[in-house]
Amino acid sequence: MLKTKRKLTKAIGVALSISILSSLVSFIPQTNTYAAGTYNYGEALQKSIMFYEFQRSGDLPADKRDNWRDDSGMKDGSDVGVDLTGGWYDAGDHVKFNLPMSYTSAMLAWSLYEDKDAYDKSGQTKYIMDGIKWANDYFIKCNPTPGVYYYQVGDGGKDHSWWGPAEVMQMERPSFKVDASKPGSAVCASTAASLASAAVVFKSSDPTYAEKCISHAKNLFDMADKAKSDAGYTAASGYYSSSSFYDDLSWAAVWLYLATNDSTYLDKAESYVPNWGKEQQTDIIAYKWGQCWDDVHYGAELLLAKLTNKQLYKDSIEMNLDFWTTGVNGTRVSYTPKGLAWLFQWGSLRHATTQAFLAGVYAEWEGCTPSKVSVYKDFLKSQIDYALGSTGRSFVVGYGVNPPQHPHHRTAHGSWTDQMTSPTYHRHTIYGALVGGPDNADGYTDEINNYVNNEIACDYNAGFTGALAKMYKHSGGDPIPNFKAIEKITNDEVIIKAGLNSTGPNYTEIKAVVYNQTGWPARVTDKISFKYFMDLSEIVAAGIDPLSLVTSSNYSEGKNTKVSGVLPWDVSNNVYYVNVDLTGENIYPGGQSACRREVQFRIAAPQGTTYWNPKNDFSYDGLPTTSTVNTVTNIPVYDNGVKVFGNEPAGGSENPDPEILYGDVNSDKNVDALDFAALKKYLLGGTSSIDVKAADTYKDGNIDAIDMATLKKYLLGTITQLPQG
C-alpha cells in the first residue's frame, strides 16, 4: 500500500482544482428534496458508527458488539514510559495518526451537536458518544503534562511492511511527540478542537468529563497558538503532512468558544482568518476544495457564519458550496457521468459526502440564502444516495446491494500468512466502512490491493456519518434492532497437518505441523499441544510394556518442544498416546513461519523386533504415507489443555484434573464474581487472557453459555461442585 498517496495538501489541491473544473454543461441531479427515503438511512447510520468500533486500539470494553476484535497495541507508549493505549487505527493499517484521528472525532461531535435528536431517535446516541469518548480519552493520555503532546504511535514504513491483524502485531511501535522545542501547531490545534467539541456534547451528561476535555483543549490550543509552527511534526511526513495550521487554530478556537462561552476564543478564531489559504492570485478565501483533515477552514467559516452572522463567512461558505453544486463564475467541481461530485482520486466519496454534510448543516440555518436551500439539500441527498447504491452498487461494506467485499484492511481481511492474497476472501465484515470510491468515470474495482479506491479510513466515515444523520432526520429508515457483528467462525482456527516422515520394522516417524490461523479474534497461542494415539495391542501381545517404548525428536521448529514418553489413554483396549507439548512457543497468525511449528518425532519398539504395526493406530488413520503433510483430524490439538481441533478415541480419563480450579477463569486462585465477569467478556467477543481449561465448568470441551450458566449456579449456591456435566 502506498499510503503516501493518501496525503492531501493545499498545494496539490490548488493544482488539481484547476484541472477538475468544468463548464456548467449540466446541473446536479434533481431530486425531490428530502423525499421519502430511497435507502434505509437509519441502518446506514447505525453501521457507519459501528465502523469505529472495529478501528479501536487498546483494551476493548466488555460490551463490544463483535467477536473478531480483541485487545491490541497494549504496549503503546512503553518506549517513553507513558500509557498511550487506546485511540483508533487510521485506516487499513495500524498506525495511530492523531491529525486525521482528531479531525474525525471533531466531525462526529459536530454531527451530534447539530442533530442529537436524530441520534436519540435512531438509538445511536450511546454509540456515537462512546466513539467520541474513545478517541478523546486517548488524546488526554497523549497530553500527559502541559506542553507535551504525543501525536503519533507507530512507524508507517514498518507498519505497512506487514499484513496481518492488529491483535498479533509484533513490530516496534515508536511514540512521537511535539513540545516547545519541536512544535506541531496543526496537530495540537486539531486535537484541541476534538477535545473542545467533545466537551460540548458531553457537557450535559458528564460535566466532569467535559471540564477535563476543556482543560486539555486549552493546553493544546496554547501550545499551537504560541508556536505557530509545524517544525517538529515530522513522523507523519509522507502520510499526513500538514500544509497549514491557521485553519486548525480557527477550528479549535471556534469549538473552545462553544465549549466555554469565552468570547476571547471567538476573537481568536477570527484573528487567524487573514492567514487562511486564498485562491491563486486573489484575496478570495479558498473555496475550490472541501472540508478534510488537512483543511478545516470550511468548517470553521460555516460555524463562524452561524455564530457571527457576518457576510464575509456567509459569502465564503456559499462560494464553497456553490462550487460543489451550481458552480461559481462558470466553474464547479467535476461530476462523474452517474452524478458523483468528484474532487480527487483518493477518497472521492469521502470528499463528496463530507461536503454533503456541510451543505446539510448550512441549508438548515436561517442565514442560508433562501434560493439555495433546496439546491444544497438536493446535493446532500444525491451524494449520500450515490454512496448507498444509486448506481446499482453500494460503496459501504455490509450495507445495501453489491457492497464491497474486499476492502484494503488488514484486520478485516484476517490473513495468517502476512499476505493480502491469502485467504482469497475476507474473513470479517467491517460493517459501515465507506470505501474510497470510484474514479472520475464511475470506475471501481473491489480488490484488496486497490488502495486508491478500496481502502477505508476513519476520516472517510467522518462527514459521511454526519450526512447520514441528516438524511435519517428528514427521510427516516429503521436501524436493525440489537445489531451486532457476531460472526460464525468459518474455518478451524487451529489445525494440524501431518505425514509419514519415515517408517521401519520397529518404528514410525511422524512429521506434524501445527498452524494458528485464529481470527475470532486473532490471538497468540503459547500453550499448544497435540496427541498421537496408538493401538498397542501387538506390543502387549508380545509381552512388552507399552510404557517402555522409546520416543524421540530429531527436528523441531520450536525451542521449547517437549515430546513425552508413551502414556496410557484406555489401557483396557491397549490405547496409548504420545503428547507433543509446544508450551512456550508463541505461535500467531502473522506470517508463513510465525503461524506454524513443525515437529518430527519417532515412536520405536526395541531394536531388532518386528511386531510393530502402526496401521491399527487411531492417529495413523488418514495419515499420508509420505512426508508431504495434509490436514488430519485424528491427531487432536489442545490449547492450554482444551481440545480445539480433531478427534480423540473413545475412553480416556473421566476424572477432573485435580490441579485445575474450575471456575477460576481469571487465575487469581479464587472463584468469585470476577471470574463470572471475565467469562462473560470472553463470550461477548473474546479475550485471550482467561484460563480456558478452568472456564470449562460444564466439562464438555467447549467454552460457551452453558459454562457461564454453570458458574452462575455455583456462585449462587444452587450447585456446590465444579465441574458439572
From Swiss-Prot:
Molecular functions per Gene Ontology: cellulase activity; cellulose binding
Keyword DNA-binding found: no
Any GO BP annotation: cellulose catabolic process
PROSITE patterns: CBM3, CLOS_CELLULOSOME_RPT, DOCKERIN, EF_HAND_1, GH9_1, GH9_2, GH9_3
Pathway of action: Glycan metabolism; cellulose degradation
Keyword field: Carbohydrate metabolism, Cellulose degradation, Glycosidase, Hydrolase, Polysaccharide degradation, Signal
CBM3 domain ranges (all copies): 489-650
Keyword Transcription regulation: no
SUPFAM superfamilies documented for this protein: Carbohydrate-binding domain, Six-hairpin glycosidases, Type I dockerin domain
EC code: 3.2.1.4
Signal peptide per UniProt: 1-35
InterPro entries, alphabetized: 6-hairpin_glycosidase_sf, 6hp_glycosidase-like_sf, CBM2/CBM3_carb-bd_dom_sf, CBM3, CBM3_sf, Dockerin_1_rpt, Dockerin_dom, Dockerin_dom_sf
Dockerin domain segment(s): 658-724
Active site residues per record: D93, H408, D446, E455
Listed Pfam families: CBM_3, Dockerin_1, Glyco_hydro_9
Catalytic activity, as annotated: Endohydrolysis of (1->4)-beta-D-glucosidic linkages in cellulose, lichenin and cereal beta-D-glucans
Family: Belongs to the glycosyl hydrolase 9 (cellulase E) family.
Function: The biological conversion of cellulose to glucose generally requires three types of hydrolytic enzymes: (1) Endoglucanases which cut internal beta-1,4-glucosidic bonds; (2) Exocellobiohydrolases that cut the disaccharide cellobiose from the non-reducing end of the cellulose polymer chain; (3) Beta-1,4-glucosidases which hydrolyze the cellobiose and other short cello-oligosaccharides to glucose.
Name of this chain's protein: Endoglucanase G
